[in-house]
């Protein structure tokens, strides 16, 4: 199991010697006894969050971590049904959410997908395990800290049913409420609202309209605009394609791909076509355990995995395979992610062939 280490390049020079000594202690800890291990790690690292328990002054002067650029590790995350440790929902899950990549949590119903993202987003505390991003660690049963609150403010969560997170009677209020609470704008800042509505493809929508009157696709976009208006750096989406038509799904995919350079994105989905078009990495859960962590291309090209777990390949992979079996090879086959890409490749292929007279 990975042991956290304090990153010296993120803290002031005068604390380097103290941090080096702490890293030596961390390296010597025995990780076999999990509960005592977490408590000891927490005790060693915690002084580096604050100067003392009374003054909430960050040691690192806002350089504790770069949430959109530092990898986020989760280590031995386990969640039980209750405090008596009856039944595990997720079991010893470890992995990494990389920056500038879209990661999908994939698996059958009841595999623990939603439970895992609630741990990654700090919405629930794990029974065991910890999350580590640069010099920030979040442990099972850890008390709320100011730095944890600051970390949470950078995380946006979009529910499967977007309307479940609507609280206001107008689109303008819905977009601005979270941002106003964080003091990022004032209550009737139309320009601020339109900036994020435009970003999400809602540039022509009336601001006085009730969010409930929107289509399912528009509701998803409004929920996304409301979250982005809070300037989050870590975006979590739970089954974002449910209820959307193909055009809305395609637009959502393009939007998320464009955002990934500035926002860490994690998606829970069982829509294999959307996953193949949108994501870079896949974490496959089965009965609460992670069984695969790999690139999306590698996952869907492994026919034995797909057959073993009863997964139907994306339609575009089936179409490309059909062309290959007919003797048609594509120059940029690895880049074919959707129907538009396939049509473009076919046009290029046949435009290069000389006409037969």
Swiss-Prot record:
Residue positions binding ATP: 107-114
GO MF annotation, one: ATP binding
GO terms for cellular component: ATP-binding cassette (ABC) transporter complex
Keywords associated with the record: ATP-binding, Nucleotide-binding, Transport
Species this chain originates from: Mycoplasma genitalium (strain ATCC 33530 / DSM 19775 / NCTC 10195 / G37) (Mycoplasmoides genitalium)
Domain ABC transporter: 72-312
Name of the protein described by the UniProt record: Putative ABC transporter ATP-binding protein MG303
Family according to the record: Belongs to the ABC transporter superfamily.
